[in-house]
Amino acid sequence: MKITKTDGPPKDVLYFDEEYKDDELDLSPQDVEDVAEIFKTPLTGSYNWDYTVADNRIKKLYELGKELNWNGSIDLDWDYNHPKDEPLTGIEGVTLPHEELDAWKNLTDEEKIEFDRHETAEVLSQFLHGEQGALLVASQIVSCAPTFNAKMYAASQTFDEARHVEVFNRYLQEKVGFHYPINPNLKAVLDKILTDERWDLKFIGMQIIIEGLALAAFTNMKLSANDTLLKTLLHYVIRDEARHVTFGINYLEDFVQTLSPEEIEERAQFAYEACVISRDRLINTKAMSKYLKMTDEEVRDFQLSNGAMDQFRSFLFSRVMPNLKKIGLLTDSVRPKYEALGILEYEHAPSDFEIDWAEITKPLESSDQVKAESDEMLSEILKAQEAANS
């Protein structure tokens, strides 16, 4: 075993050699090098000595987590290989803003497919890095959450996050062949959450902000995925994430009521700052910069100036704002700040507090069922957009 310690994450795209995709390749510990970046956190743990199991929604969510566990190695069809001459993502009849640029039109068909793979890989890589962050935070919450129910659920979530890291990593290595480094803004928000000493701020940052945004981003990619394996993988991950977000809202709604007004304001400000960083995180620049011959700053300006990014950002924060309101963190002091970001209007969207038990307890769907459900959802969204634009 070789462990190399670094002062920060890698900055270059990591390519995986074809030989390492051979299932029969037997790697010894001496053949593997782990690259580790050290972070320090003043974590304060707690025992719970009464082992009280409250008969409530959190207990039910914990039981569901055990019942609905899935195995990333056998429940996904890893034998499926998407045709290399077809894009991994894209919606028929929908033109993306960058496809109007001369730089994209001048690409050959092969280059357009290659660009699609790199752009998809850049987004999926952020999913992978974010899930590792969620894995680390969930493991911290096991130690420092004060109640027995919260510790038990965080333990089950830790295993969920490990499974998500596993499947995203495997897809990128085996089906794409490379992954991108972490977006600096995503790294900033993960650092902010992981190194804070207060367990409930970790909880707010991860369960409400990061997981809420991830749930929306995963859904967006699932709807546009052409790769059957990728679409099904995302669907299974979304099922888990929906439970995680619901757990966070149900637990925090009660907990926030135990805090003083000053403590609530402090946490409301923390959530706002996490949203600001996460809003910038949505802009990935590397693939577009490489293939469309733009600087990172030009890509950022282009992304911020087109309506598609505003629409995508709205979709993301429509999952976060109502949840912040539900747990009591849309205070009078931060509301104008969210208004300035242009996302306060989503406070009235449906929150994830109410649980559709019939939906959340369904057995794992087949790939065909996932595709049919995804196509139906996409059709409804496109019809709504068409009606809004008419």
Features from the language model and the residues they span:
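Terminal targeting/low-complexity segments that flank the catalytic cores of oxidoreductases
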Residues: 1-139, 143-151, 174-181, 185, ...
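Alpha-helical transition-metal enzyme core signature, strongest for iron centers
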Residues: 127-135, 157-172, 207-218, 237-248, ...
